[in-house]
A protein has these predicted regions:
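Intrinsically disordered, low-complexity regulatory regions
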Residues: 1-89
């Protein structure tokens, strides 16, 4: 097994199937993009929500007990908070 195959196998145990993940992630992102407030969001808010939706799909498709998924979500939310509070990000 080469390095790429090894990494993909390792990730599938925590992230689940890439195809399922892509489907769920895109579906979640469509919900956000259709929201009433999407157009008024900053690029920081939009990107953070995209990443949070991506992480949520990893939780629902993969291992929901993987601490890094939850830490990543908290990190993206914190970046938005800091941006809105005019703290350096």
């Amino acid at each position: 097994m080469n390095k790429i195959d090894s990494t993909l196998a390792e990730r599938s145990s925590t992230h689940g199937s890439f195809a399922e993940n892509a489907f769920d992630s895109q579906r979640l992102k469509r919900v956000v993009k259709r929201s009433n407030s999407y157009e008024s969001m900053t690029h920081v808010q939009r990107e953070a929500l995209d990443m949070i939706m991506h992480k949520i799909s990893r939780i629902t498709c993969g291992n929901p007990h993987e601490p890094d998924h939850w830490l990543d979500i908290a990190g993206y939310a914190t970046l938005v908070y800091k941006d809105l509070s005019n703290e350096a990000i």
